[in-house]
Protein backbone atom coordinates (compact mmCIF):
# COMPACT_ATOMS: atom_id res chain seq x y z
CA UNK A 1 0.00 0.00 0.00
CA UNK A 2 1.15 3.54 -0.72
CA UNK A 3 2.37 4.97 2.56
CA UNK A 4 0.66 8.29 1.82
CA UNK A 5 -2.67 6.48 2.01
CA UNK A 6 -2.03 4.56 5.20
CA UNK A 7 -4.41 6.79 7.19
CA UNK A 8 -7.11 6.61 4.52
CA UNK A 9 -8.65 3.39 5.80
CA UNK A 10 -12.31 3.14 6.65
CA UNK A 11 -13.31 6.41 5.05
CA UNK A 12 -10.43 8.49 6.37
CA UNK A 13 -9.35 11.21 3.94
CA UNK A 14 -5.64 11.11 3.12
CA UNK A 15 -3.54 13.11 5.56
CA UNK A 16 -2.62 15.64 2.87
CA UNK A 17 -6.28 16.57 2.42
CA UNK A 18 -6.66 17.29 6.11
CA UNK A 19 -3.47 19.32 6.47
CA UNK A 20 -4.85 22.72 5.50
CA UNK A 21 -7.92 22.25 7.64
CA UNK A 22 -5.78 21.44 10.66
CA UNK A 23 -3.45 24.39 10.17
CA UNK A 24 -6.25 26.88 10.37
CA UNK A 25 -7.93 26.90 6.97
CA UNK A 26 -9.76 30.16 6.83
CA UNK A 27 -9.32 31.36 10.38
CA UNK A 28 -6.67 33.83 11.56
CA UNK A 29 -3.16 34.14 10.24
CA UNK A 30 -2.51 31.08 8.15
CA UNK A 31 1.27 31.51 8.34
CA UNK A 32 1.63 31.25 12.12
CA UNK A 33 0.47 28.44 14.36
CA UNK A 34 1.58 28.73 17.96
CA UNK A 35 2.09 25.82 20.29
CA UNK A 36 -0.86 25.59 22.63
CA UNK A 37 -3.20 27.73 20.50
CA UNK A 38 -5.85 26.56 18.08
CA UNK A 39 -8.35 28.40 15.93
CA UNK A 40 -12.02 27.49 15.86
CA UNK A 41 -11.63 25.85 12.45
CA UNK A 42 -8.69 23.79 13.74
CA UNK A 43 -10.69 22.70 16.75
CA UNK A 44 -13.56 21.63 14.51
CA UNK A 45 -11.07 19.66 12.42
CA UNK A 46 -9.82 17.83 15.51
CA UNK A 47 -13.37 17.01 16.59
CA UNK A 48 -14.11 15.77 13.08
CA UNK A 49 -10.99 13.60 13.07
CA UNK A 50 -11.92 11.94 16.34
CA UNK A 51 -15.50 11.39 15.23
CA UNK A 52 -14.26 9.54 12.14
CA UNK A 53 -11.95 7.13 13.93
CA UNK A 54 -12.71 3.54 13.10
CA UNK A 55 -14.50 1.40 15.65
CA UNK A 56 -13.70 -2.18 16.51
CA UNK A 57 -17.14 -3.12 15.23
CA UNK A 58 -15.99 -2.11 11.74
CA UNK A 59 -13.70 -5.16 11.60
CA UNK A 60 -13.83 -8.91 11.73
CA UNK A 61 -10.94 -10.19 13.83
CA UNK A 62 -8.90 -13.30 14.49
CA UNK A 63 -6.45 -13.48 17.39
CA UNK A 64 -2.95 -14.33 16.21
CA UNK A 65 -0.79 -13.57 19.25
CA UNK A 66 -0.36 -11.96 22.65
CA UNK A 67 2.43 -10.45 24.70
CA UNK A 68 3.16 -8.66 27.93
CA UNK A 69 1.31 -5.48 27.02
CA UNK A 70 -1.11 -6.33 24.25
CA UNK A 71 -3.03 -8.81 22.15
CA UNK A 72 -2.63 -8.92 18.38
CA UNK A 73 -5.46 -9.66 15.95
CA UNK A 74 -5.64 -10.13 12.22
CA UNK A 75 -8.53 -7.87 11.21
CA UNK A 76 -10.45 -7.29 8.01
CA UNK A 77 -12.40 -4.10 7.43
CA UNK A 78 -16.01 -5.04 6.75
CA UNK A 79 -16.59 -2.36 4.11
CA UNK A 80 -13.30 -2.29 2.19
CA UNK A 81 -12.02 -5.81 2.84
CA UNK A 82 -8.61 -4.42 3.79
CA UNK A 83 -6.54 -6.76 5.98
CA UNK A 84 -4.45 -5.30 8.81
CA UNK A 85 -3.09 -6.19 12.23
CA UNK A 86 -4.71 -4.72 15.34
CA UNK A 87 -2.59 -4.29 18.46
CA UNK A 88 -4.90 -3.95 21.47
CA UNK A 89 -3.39 -2.66 24.70
CA UNK A 90 -4.30 -4.83 27.72
CA UNK A 91 -2.37 -3.02 30.46
CA UNK A 92 -3.68 0.34 31.66
CA UNK A 93 -0.30 1.48 32.98
CA UNK A 94 1.20 0.96 29.50
CA UNK A 95 -1.17 3.38 27.79
CA UNK A 96 1.43 6.13 27.54
CA UNK A 97 3.96 3.80 25.91
CA UNK A 98 1.33 2.70 23.39
CA UNK A 99 0.56 6.29 22.41
CA UNK A 100 4.26 7.00 22.07
CA UNK A 101 4.67 3.92 19.89
CA UNK A 102 1.88 5.03 17.56
CA UNK A 103 3.38 8.50 17.23
CA UNK A 104 6.83 7.11 16.51
CA UNK A 105 5.63 4.57 13.94
CA UNK A 106 3.69 7.32 12.18
CA UNK A 107 6.98 9.18 11.66
CA UNK A 108 8.94 6.22 10.32
CA UNK A 109 9.03 5.05 6.72
CA UNK A 110 11.24 2.09 5.85
CA UNK A 111 10.60 -1.32 4.25
CA UNK A 112 12.05 -3.09 7.30
CA UNK A 113 10.06 -1.10 9.86
CA UNK A 114 6.47 -2.15 10.60
CA UNK A 115 4.12 0.25 8.79
CA UNK A 116 1.54 2.18 10.80
CA UNK A 117 -1.91 2.21 9.16
CA UNK A 118 -4.22 4.05 11.54
CA UNK A 119 -6.07 4.01 14.84
CA UNK A 120 -9.06 2.06 16.12
CA UNK A 121 -11.26 3.04 19.07
CA UNK A 122 -12.71 0.48 21.47
CA UNK A 123 -14.18 1.11 24.92
CA UNK A 124 -12.65 4.56 25.13
CA UNK A 125 -9.11 3.47 24.23
CA UNK A 126 -6.99 3.92 21.14
CA UNK A 127 -5.44 0.85 19.53
CA UNK A 128 -2.90 0.72 16.71
CA UNK A 129 -3.63 -0.63 13.24
CA UNK A 130 -0.54 -1.77 11.35
CA UNK A 131 0.26 -3.69 8.20
CA UNK A 132 -0.37 -7.42 8.48
CA UNK A 133 2.76 -9.58 8.34
CA UNK A 134 1.87 -13.06 7.14
CA UNK A 135 4.50 -15.43 8.58
CA UNK A 136 4.69 -14.77 12.29
CA UNK A 137 7.91 -13.77 14.01
CA UNK A 138 11.53 -14.82 13.74
CA UNK A 139 11.43 -16.98 16.85
CA UNK A 140 8.59 -19.04 15.37
CA UNK A 141 10.37 -19.41 12.03
CA UNK A 142 13.59 -20.62 13.65
CA UNK A 143 11.65 -23.08 15.78
CA UNK A 144 9.91 -24.58 12.74
CA UNK A 145 11.08 -27.51 10.61
CA UNK A 146 11.52 -25.35 7.52
CA UNK A 147 14.87 -25.59 5.79
CA UNK A 148 16.69 -22.25 5.88
CA UNK A 149 19.93 -22.04 3.87
CA UNK A 150 22.60 -19.60 4.95
CA UNK A 151 21.66 -17.18 2.20
CA UNK A 152 18.18 -16.86 3.71
CA UNK A 153 19.48 -16.51 7.25
CA UNK A 154 22.00 -13.84 6.34
CA UNK A 155 19.29 -12.02 4.37
CA UNK A 156 17.01 -11.96 7.43
CA UNK A 157 19.89 -10.68 9.56
CA UNK A 158 20.55 -7.99 6.95
CA UNK A 159 16.89 -6.86 6.93
CA UNK A 160 16.90 -6.42 10.70
CA UNK A 161 20.21 -4.56 10.60
CA UNK A 162 19.14 -2.03 7.96
CA UNK A 163 15.86 -1.42 9.79
CA UNK A 164 17.75 -0.69 13.00
CA UNK A 165 20.29 1.42 11.11
CA UNK A 166 17.42 3.57 9.85
CA UNK A 167 15.97 3.86 13.37
CA UNK A 168 19.33 4.90 14.84
CA UNK A 169 19.80 7.39 12.02
CA UNK A 170 16.57 9.02 13.17
CA UNK A 171 18.02 9.42 16.66
CA UNK A 172 15.97 6.64 18.27
CA UNK A 173 16.99 3.23 19.59
CA UNK A 174 14.71 0.26 20.19
CA UNK A 175 15.62 -1.04 23.69
CA UNK A 176 13.49 -4.18 23.30
CA UNK A 177 14.96 -5.88 20.25
CA UNK A 178 14.17 -9.60 20.38
CA UNK A 179 13.41 -12.40 17.94
CA UNK A 180 9.76 -12.05 19.01
CA UNK A 181 9.73 -8.44 17.79
CA UNK A 182 11.17 -9.23 14.36
CA UNK A 183 8.28 -10.20 12.10
CA UNK A 184 8.66 -12.40 9.03
CA UNK A 185 7.07 -11.64 5.68
CA UNK A 186 6.96 -14.26 2.93
CA UNK A 187 6.16 -13.49 -0.71
CA UNK A 188 7.25 -14.49 -4.20
CA UNK A 189 10.72 -13.10 -3.46
CA UNK A 190 11.21 -15.25 -0.37
CA UNK A 191 11.55 -14.22 3.26
CA UNK A 192 12.10 -10.74 4.62
CA UNK A 193 12.19 -9.35 8.17
CA UNK A 194 10.40 -6.33 9.63
CA UNK A 195 11.21 -4.74 13.00
CA UNK A 196 8.20 -4.04 15.23
CA UNK A 197 7.18 -3.10 18.80
CA UNK A 198 8.54 0.37 19.55
CA UNK A 199 6.77 0.87 22.87
CA UNK A 200 10.06 1.12 24.78
CA UNK A 201 11.97 3.09 22.14
CA UNK A 202 13.96 6.03 23.44
CA UNK A 203 15.95 8.96 22.14
CA UNK A 204 19.65 8.12 21.80
CA UNK A 205 21.40 9.89 24.69
CA UNK A 206 24.04 12.49 23.97
CA UNK A 207 27.10 11.68 26.04
CA UNK A 208 28.58 15.13 25.43
CA UNK A 209 25.85 16.89 27.40
CA UNK A 210 25.49 14.38 30.22
CA UNK A 211 22.02 13.03 29.47
CA UNK A 212 19.86 11.52 32.19
CA UNK A 213 20.64 7.87 32.86
CA UNK A 214 18.02 5.68 31.25
CA UNK A 215 15.93 3.16 33.15
CA UNK A 216 16.38 -0.60 32.95
CA UNK A 217 13.90 -1.79 30.31
CA UNK A 218 13.56 -4.69 27.92
CA UNK A 219 13.57 -8.49 27.88
CA UNK A 220 16.44 -9.87 30.03
CA UNK A 221 17.73 -12.61 27.68
CA UNK A 222 18.39 -9.97 25.00
CA UNK A 223 19.40 -7.06 27.25
CA UNK A 224 22.98 -5.82 27.12
CA UNK A 225 25.11 -6.47 30.22
CA UNK A 226 25.46 -2.76 30.96
CA UNK A 227 21.66 -2.43 30.99
CA UNK A 228 21.26 -5.38 33.35
CA UNK A 229 23.82 -3.81 35.68
CA UNK A 230 21.85 -0.53 35.67
CA UNK A 231 24.76 1.38 34.16
CA UNK A 232 24.52 4.21 31.61
CA UNK A 233 23.87 2.82 28.13
CA UNK A 234 23.22 4.00 24.60
CA UNK A 235 22.27 2.66 21.16
CA UNK A 236 25.01 0.02 21.35
CA UNK A 237 22.68 -1.89 23.69
CA UNK A 238 20.59 -2.63 20.58
CA UNK A 239 23.68 -4.11 18.93
CA UNK A 240 24.15 -6.61 21.76
CA UNK A 241 20.47 -7.60 21.52
CA UNK A 242 20.99 -8.04 17.79
CA UNK A 243 24.00 -10.27 18.50
CA UNK A 244 21.84 -12.57 20.62
CA UNK A 245 19.35 -12.72 17.73
CA UNK A 246 22.21 -13.71 15.40
CA UNK A 247 23.04 -16.55 17.79
CA UNK A 248 19.43 -17.71 17.53
CA UNK A 249 19.61 -17.53 13.74
CA UNK A 250 22.90 -19.43 13.49
CA UNK A 251 22.15 -22.29 15.88
CA UNK A 252 18.34 -22.20 15.62
CA UNK A 253 18.00 -22.27 19.38
CA UNK A 254 16.18 -20.14 21.91
CA UNK A 255 17.85 -17.21 23.66
CA UNK A 256 17.20 -18.92 26.99
CA UNK A 257 20.56 -19.69 28.70
CA UNK A 258 19.39 -23.28 29.07
CA UNK A 259 20.04 -23.47 25.30
CA UNK A 260 22.29 -20.51 24.45
CA UNK A 261 25.46 -20.66 26.60
CA UNK A 262 26.11 -17.50 28.63
CA UNK A 263 28.73 -16.38 31.13
CA UNK A 264 28.22 -15.27 34.71
CA UNK A 265 28.58 -11.61 33.72
CA UNK A 266 25.70 -11.89 31.17
CA UNK A 267 27.99 -12.23 28.17
CA UNK A 268 28.00 -14.87 25.44
CA UNK A 269 30.10 -17.98 26.06
CA UNK A 270 31.96 -17.83 22.74
CA UNK A 271 33.88 -21.07 23.19
CA UNK A 272 30.80 -23.12 24.05
CA UNK A 273 28.69 -21.54 21.32
CA UNK A 274 31.13 -22.21 18.47
CA UNK A 275 30.57 -25.95 19.01
CA UNK A 276 26.91 -25.43 18.06
CA UNK A 277 27.24 -23.61 14.75
CA UNK A 278 27.85 -26.44 12.26
CA UNK A 279 29.00 -25.09 8.88
CA UNK A 280 28.17 -21.46 9.66
CA UNK A 281 30.21 -19.06 7.49
CA UNK A 282 33.16 -17.94 9.59
CA UNK A 283 32.69 -14.26 8.79
CA UNK A 284 29.04 -14.46 9.85
CA UNK A 285 30.06 -16.04 13.16
CA UNK A 286 32.79 -13.44 13.63
CA UNK A 287 30.24 -10.66 13.14
CA UNK A 288 28.00 -12.29 15.74
CA UNK A 289 30.82 -12.37 18.28
CA UNK A 290 31.65 -8.72 17.57
CA UNK A 291 28.04 -7.71 18.24
CA UNK A 292 28.00 -9.65 21.53
CA UNK A 293 31.13 -7.95 22.85
CA UNK A 294 30.82 -7.02 26.53
CA UNK A 295 32.45 -3.65 25.83
CA UNK A 296 29.87 -1.40 24.09
CA UNK A 297 32.63 0.63 22.45
CA UNK A 298 33.90 -2.45 20.62
CA UNK A 299 30.53 -3.32 19.11
CA UNK A 300 30.00 -2.26 15.49
CA UNK A 301 27.30 0.16 14.41
CA UNK A 302 24.33 -1.08 12.41
CA UNK A 303 25.65 0.77 9.39
CA UNK A 304 28.87 -1.26 9.61
CA UNK A 305 26.88 -4.44 10.25
CA UNK A 306 24.80 -3.85 7.13
CA UNK A 307 27.89 -3.42 4.96
CA UNK A 308 29.46 -6.58 6.34
CA UNK A 309 26.30 -8.60 5.74
CA UNK A 310 26.09 -7.31 2.17
CA UNK A 311 29.57 -8.69 1.52
CA UNK A 312 28.68 -12.02 3.14
CA UNK A 313 25.48 -12.31 1.09
CA UNK A 314 27.31 -11.53 -2.13
CA UNK A 315 29.95 -14.17 -1.41
CA UNK A 316 27.36 -16.82 -0.46
CA UNK A 317 25.37 -16.17 -3.62
CA UNK A 318 28.49 -16.53 -5.77
CA UNK A 319 29.36 -19.80 -4.03
CA UNK A 320 25.83 -21.05 -4.57
CA UNK A 321 25.96 -20.24 -8.28
CA UNK A 322 29.32 -21.95 -8.61
CA UNK A 323 28.01 -25.03 -6.85
CA UNK A 324 24.99 -25.14 -9.17
CA UNK A 325 27.25 -24.90 -12.23
CA UNK A 326 29.29 -27.86 -11.01
CA UNK A 327 26.15 -29.91 -10.39
CA UNK A 328 24.62 -29.26 -13.83
CA UNK A 329 26.91 -31.63 -15.85
CA UNK A 330 26.37 -34.40 -13.30
CA UNK A 331 22.61 -34.00 -13.42
CA UNK A 332 22.66 -33.95 -17.22
CA UNK A 333 24.64 -37.21 -17.31
CA UNK A 334 22.19 -38.91 -14.99
CA UNK A 335 19.25 -37.90 -17.17
CA UNK A 336 20.95 -39.29 -20.29
CA UNK A 337 21.34 -42.72 -18.62
CA UNK A 338 17.68 -42.98 -17.69
CA UNK A 339 15.43 -44.70 -20.31
CA UNK A 340 13.03 -42.22 -21.87
CA UNK A 341 14.93 -39.32 -20.38
CA UNK A 342 12.93 -39.42 -17.17
CA UNK A 343 14.45 -37.74 -14.16
CA UNK A 344 15.71 -39.97 -11.39
CA UNK A 345 13.76 -39.73 -8.14
CA UNK A 346 15.69 -40.60 -5.03
CA UNK A 347 15.73 -39.75 -1.36
CA UNK A 348 18.73 -37.51 -1.99
CA UNK A 349 16.62 -35.31 -4.27
CA UNK A 350 14.32 -34.53 -1.36
CA UNK A 351 17.01 -33.78 1.19
CA UNK A 352 18.85 -30.43 1.10
CA UNK A 353 22.53 -30.71 0.26
CA UNK A 354 23.52 -28.90 3.43
CA UNK A 355 21.33 -27.88 6.29
CA UNK A 356 23.25 -25.49 8.54
CA UNK A 357 21.40 -26.49 11.67
CA UNK A 358 23.46 -28.90 13.79
CA UNK A 359 22.40 -29.64 17.33
CA UNK A 360 24.13 -30.83 20.46
CA UNK A 361 21.92 -33.89 20.45
CA UNK A 362 20.31 -35.81 17.60
CA UNK A 363 16.79 -35.37 18.96
CA UNK A 364 17.05 -31.64 18.36
CA UNK A 365 17.80 -32.08 14.65
CA UNK A 366 15.22 -31.44 11.95
CA UNK A 367 16.74 -33.32 9.00
CA UNK A 368 19.26 -36.05 8.19
CA UNK A 369 21.85 -33.51 7.11
CA UNK A 370 21.53 -31.78 10.48
CA UNK A 371 22.89 -34.93 12.06
CA UNK A 372 25.74 -35.68 9.67
CA UNK A 373 26.98 -32.20 8.68
CA UNK A 374 28.66 -31.42 12.02
CA UNK A 375 32.08 -29.88 11.55
CA UNK A 376 34.90 -29.39 14.06
CA UNK A 377 34.92 -25.96 15.71
CA UNK A 378 36.80 -23.29 13.82
CA UNK A 379 39.10 -20.66 15.28
CA UNK A 380 37.34 -17.33 15.69
CA UNK A 381 39.01 -14.17 16.90
CA UNK A 382 37.46 -13.10 20.21
CA UNK A 383 38.45 -9.58 21.25
CA UNK A 384 36.31 -9.34 24.38
CA UNK A 385 38.34 -8.09 27.38
CA UNK A 386 35.64 -9.26 29.80
CA UNK A 387 35.18 -12.78 28.48
CA UNK A 388 35.65 -15.49 31.11
CA UNK A 389 35.38 -18.95 29.49
CA UNK A 390 34.31 -21.93 31.53
CA UNK A 391 37.00 -24.39 32.55
CA UNK A 392 36.35 -27.45 30.41
CA UNK A 393 38.82 -29.57 32.39
CA UNK A 394 36.81 -29.21 35.59
CA UNK A 395 33.50 -29.75 33.77
CA UNK A 396 32.02 -26.48 35.02
CA UNK A 397 28.23 -26.70 34.73
CA UNK A 398 26.30 -24.50 32.36
CA UNK A 399 25.64 -21.03 33.76
CA UNK A 400 22.30 -19.24 33.92
CA UNK A 401 23.15 -15.79 35.30
CA UNK A 402 19.50 -14.75 35.17
CA UNK A 403 18.65 -17.25 37.90
CA UNK A 404 21.27 -15.80 40.24
CA UNK A 405 19.44 -12.48 40.59
CA UNK A 406 16.05 -12.53 42.23
CA UNK A 407 14.80 -9.43 40.42
CA UNK A 408 15.36 -11.07 37.02
CA UNK A 409 13.14 -14.06 37.91
CA UNK A 410 15.15 -16.35 35.67
CA UNK A 411 14.72 -13.96 32.74
CA UNK A 412 10.97 -14.60 32.50
CA UNK A 413 10.03 -10.96 33.04
CA UNK A 414 9.90 -7.78 31.02
CA UNK A 415 11.00 -4.42 32.36
CA UNK A 416 9.29 -1.24 31.27
CA UNK A 417 9.16 2.43 32.19
CA UNK A 418 7.02 5.46 31.54
CA UNK A 419 8.10 7.45 28.45
CA UNK A 420 10.79 10.01 29.19
CA UNK A 421 10.39 13.66 28.33
CA UNK A 422 13.35 13.46 25.94
CA UNK A 423 11.83 11.23 23.27
CA UNK A 424 8.32 12.21 22.14
CA UNK A 425 6.03 14.39 24.24
CA UNK A 426 2.63 12.94 25.06
CA UNK A 427 1.07 16.13 26.42
CA UNK A 428 -0.87 18.34 24.05
CA UNK A 429 -2.58 21.33 25.73
CA UNK A 430 -4.79 23.37 23.39
CA UNK A 431 -5.52 26.81 24.82
CA UNK A 432 -8.84 28.46 24.09
CA UNK A 433 -8.59 32.00 22.65
CA UNK A 434 -10.31 33.64 25.57
CA UNK A 435 -9.42 35.81 28.58
CA UNK A 436 -8.18 34.39 31.83
CA UNK A 437 -5.29 32.20 32.82
CA UNK A 438 -4.98 28.92 34.60
CA UNK A 439 -1.88 27.83 36.47
CA UNK A 440 -0.02 24.71 35.50
CA UNK A 441 -0.75 23.12 38.86
CA UNK A 442 -4.48 23.56 38.33
CA UNK A 443 -4.44 21.89 34.91
CA UNK A 444 -2.11 18.98 35.25
CA UNK A 445 -1.55 16.41 37.94
CA UNK A 446 1.67 14.41 38.25
CA UNK A 447 1.88 11.10 36.46
CA UNK A 448 4.52 9.63 38.72
CA UNK A 449 7.14 10.63 41.31
CA UNK A 450 9.98 12.76 40.04
CA UNK A 451 12.48 9.92 39.97
CA UNK A 452 11.92 7.52 37.09
CA UNK A 453 11.56 3.91 38.13
CA UNK A 454 11.66 0.74 36.10
CA UNK A 455 9.11 -1.97 36.56
CA UNK A 456 8.91 -5.63 35.68
CA UNK A 457 6.14 -7.81 34.39
CA UNK A 458 5.66 -11.53 35.01
CA UNK A 459 6.59 -13.98 32.31
CA UNK A 460 3.09 -15.27 31.64
CA UNK A 461 0.72 -12.85 29.85
CA UNK A 462 -2.25 -14.65 31.39
CA UNK A 463 -0.86 -13.82 34.86
CA UNK A 464 -0.69 -10.07 34.36
CA UNK A 465 -3.67 -8.78 36.30
CA UNK A 466 -3.08 -11.12 39.21
CA UNK A 467 0.64 -10.72 39.68
CA UNK A 468 1.22 -7.03 38.94
CA UNK A 469 0.54 -4.95 42.07
CA UNK A 470 1.14 -1.76 40.10
CA UNK A 471 -1.54 -2.36 37.46
CA UNK A 472 -3.76 0.65 37.59
CA UNK A 473 -1.64 2.25 40.31
CA UNK A 474 -1.29 5.49 38.39
CA UNK A 475 -4.94 6.20 38.99
CA UNK A 476 -4.12 6.43 42.71
CA UNK A 477 -1.19 8.81 42.38
CA UNK A 478 -3.43 11.86 42.77
CA UNK A 479 -6.33 12.75 45.03
CA UNK A 480 -8.22 14.43 42.21
CA UNK A 481 -11.51 13.10 40.85
CA UNK A 482 -10.96 9.99 38.70
CA UNK A 483 -12.63 11.41 35.55
CA UNK A 484 -10.40 14.45 35.58
CA UNK A 485 -7.27 12.45 36.30
CA UNK A 486 -7.91 9.94 33.54
CA UNK A 487 -8.44 12.71 31.04
CA UNK A 488 -5.25 14.48 32.04
CA UNK A 489 -3.00 11.44 32.29
CA UNK A 490 -2.89 10.41 28.68
CA UNK A 491 -3.22 13.55 26.67
CA UNK A 492 -1.61 13.05 23.32
CA UNK A 493 0.30 15.40 21.10
CA UNK A 494 -0.02 15.38 17.33
CA UNK A 495 -2.95 13.12 16.64
CA UNK A 496 -3.32 15.39 13.56
CA UNK A 497 -0.72 15.00 10.78
CA UNK A 498 2.93 15.52 11.62
CA UNK A 499 4.84 18.30 9.90
CA UNK A 500 8.45 19.37 9.73
CA UNK A 501 9.29 22.78 11.10
CA UNK A 502 12.03 25.37 11.07
CA UNK A 503 13.65 24.45 14.37
CA UNK A 504 16.16 26.49 16.25
CA UNK A 505 19.57 25.01 16.93
CA UNK A 506 18.45 23.81 20.36
CA UNK A 507 15.12 22.37 19.32
CA UNK A 508 16.61 20.80 16.21
CA UNK A 509 18.98 18.93 18.45
CA UNK A 510 16.12 17.74 20.66
CA UNK A 511 13.67 16.81 17.92
CA UNK A 512 13.78 13.62 15.91
CA UNK A 513 14.61 13.87 12.23
CA UNK A 514 11.46 12.89 10.37
CA UNK A 515 11.75 14.89 7.17
CA UNK A 516 11.93 12.00 4.75
CA UNK A 517 8.67 10.21 5.65
CA UNK A 518 6.80 13.49 5.83
CA UNK A 519 8.01 14.66 2.45
CA UNK A 520 7.13 11.24 1.10
CA UNK A 521 3.59 11.67 2.40
CA UNK A 522 3.21 15.05 0.71
CA UNK A 523 3.89 17.33 3.67
CA UNK A 524 5.87 20.51 3.46
CA UNK A 525 7.76 22.35 6.19
CA UNK A 526 6.04 25.19 7.95
CA UNK A 527 6.89 28.77 7.02
CA UNK A 528 9.63 30.38 9.05
CA UNK A 529 8.59 31.76 12.38
CA UNK A 530 6.14 29.03 13.24
CA UNK A 531 6.51 27.01 16.39
CA UNK A 532 6.96 23.26 16.19
CA UNK A 533 4.23 20.97 17.44
CA UNK A 534 6.61 18.15 18.20
CA UNK A 535 9.52 19.67 20.11
CA UNK A 536 11.07 17.95 23.07
CA UNK A 537 9.06 18.02 26.26
CA UNK A 538 11.80 19.77 28.21
CA UNK A 539 11.67 22.71 25.80
CA UNK A 540 7.89 22.86 25.96
CA UNK A 541 7.90 22.91 29.76
CA UNK A 542 10.13 25.97 29.64
CA UNK A 543 7.67 27.67 27.31
CA UNK A 544 4.80 26.84 29.63
CA UNK A 545 6.62 28.38 32.58
CA UNK A 546 7.47 31.57 30.71
CA UNK A 547 3.99 32.45 29.46
CA UNK A 548 0.62 32.26 31.24
CA UNK A 549 -1.55 29.31 30.35
CA UNK A 550 -5.05 29.88 29.07
CA UNK A 551 -8.03 27.74 29.88
CA UNK A 552 -7.50 24.34 28.28
CA UNK A 553 -9.87 23.07 25.62
CA UNK A 554 -11.47 19.82 26.80
CA UNK A 555 -12.38 16.92 24.56
CA UNK A 556 -11.94 13.45 26.03
CA UNK A 557 -11.74 10.23 24.06
CA UNK A 558 -9.67 7.19 24.90
CA UNK A 559 -7.75 9.09 27.55
CA UNK A 560 -7.00 12.02 25.21
CA UNK A 561 -7.97 15.36 26.64
CA UNK A 562 -8.97 18.59 24.96
CA UNK A 563 -11.05 21.00 27.09
CA UNK A 564 -13.30 23.70 25.58
CA UNK A 565 -13.56 27.22 26.88
CA UNK A 566 -17.30 26.79 27.27
CA UNK A 567 -16.87 23.84 29.58
CA UNK A 568 -14.26 25.71 31.59
CA UNK A 569 -16.54 28.72 32.02
CA UNK A 570 -19.51 26.47 32.83
From Swiss-Prot:
This is Dual specificity testis-specific protein kinase 2. GO terms for biological process: actin cytoskeleton organization; apoptotic process; focal adhesion assembly; intracellular signal transduction; protein phosphorylation; spermatogenesis. PANTHER family: DUAL SPECIFICITY TESTIS-SPECIFIC PROTEIN KINASE 2, LIM DOMAIN KINASE 1. The gene is Tesk2. Belongs to the protein kinase superfamily. TKL Ser/Thr protein kinase family. Dual specificity protein kinase activity catalyzing autophosphorylation and phosphorylation of exogenous substrates on both serine/threonine and tyrosine residues. Phosphorylates cofilin at 'Ser-3'. May play an important role in spermatogenesis. The keyword Hydrolase does not apply. Residues 558-570 have a biased composition (Polar residues). It comes from the Eukaryota. Pfam families: PK_Tyr_Ser-Thr. It catalyses: L-seryl-[protein] + ATP = O-phospho-L-seryl-[protein] + ADP + H(+); L-threonyl-[protein] + ATP = O-phospho-L-threonyl-[protein] + ADP + H(+); L-tyrosyl-[protein] + ATP = O-phospho-L-tyrosyl-[protein] + ADP + H(+). Disulfide bonds: none annotated. It is found in: Nucleus. Predominantly expressed in testis and prostate. Found predominantly in non-germinal Sertoli cells. The modification Phosphoserine is found at residues 219, 369, 456, 460. SUPFAM superfamilies: Protein kinase-like (PK-like) (SSF56112). GO terms for molecular function: ATP binding; metal ion binding; protein serine kinase activity; protein serine/threonine kinase activity; protein serine/threonine/tyrosine kinase activity; protein tyrosine kinase activity. Keywords: ATP-binding, Kinase, Magnesium, Manganese, Metal-binding, Nucleotide-binding, Nucleus, Phosphoprotein, Serine/threonine-protein kinase, Transferase, Tyrosine-protein kinase. Activated by autophosphorylation on Ser-219. One of its GO terms (cellular component) is nucleus. Its cofactor is Mg(2+); Mn(2+). ATP binds at residues 64-72, 87. InterPro entries: Actin_reg-Ser/Thr_kinase, Kinase-like_dom_sf, Prot_kinase_dom, Protein_kinase_ATP_BS, Ser-Thr/Tyr_kinase_cat_dom, Tyr_kinase_AS. CDD domains: PKc_TESK. Its EC number is 2.7.12.1. Residues 58-313 form the Protein kinase domain. The active site is at 176 (proton acceptor).
Amino acid sequence: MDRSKRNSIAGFPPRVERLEEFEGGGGGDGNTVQVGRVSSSSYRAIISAFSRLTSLDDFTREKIGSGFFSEVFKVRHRASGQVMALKMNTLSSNRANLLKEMQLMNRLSHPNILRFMGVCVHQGQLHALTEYINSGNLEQLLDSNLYLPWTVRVKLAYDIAVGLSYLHFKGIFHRDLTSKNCLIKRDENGYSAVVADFGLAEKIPDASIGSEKLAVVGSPFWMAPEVLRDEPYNEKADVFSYGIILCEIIARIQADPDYLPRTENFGLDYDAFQHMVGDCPSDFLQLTFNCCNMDPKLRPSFEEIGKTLEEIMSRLQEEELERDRKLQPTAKGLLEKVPGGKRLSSLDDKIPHKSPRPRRTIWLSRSQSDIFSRKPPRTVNVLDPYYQPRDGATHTPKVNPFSARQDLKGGKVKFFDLPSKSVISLVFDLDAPGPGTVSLADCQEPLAPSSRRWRSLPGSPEFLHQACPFVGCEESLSDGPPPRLSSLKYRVREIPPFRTSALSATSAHEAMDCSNPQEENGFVPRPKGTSPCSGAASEEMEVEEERPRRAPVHFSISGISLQTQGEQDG
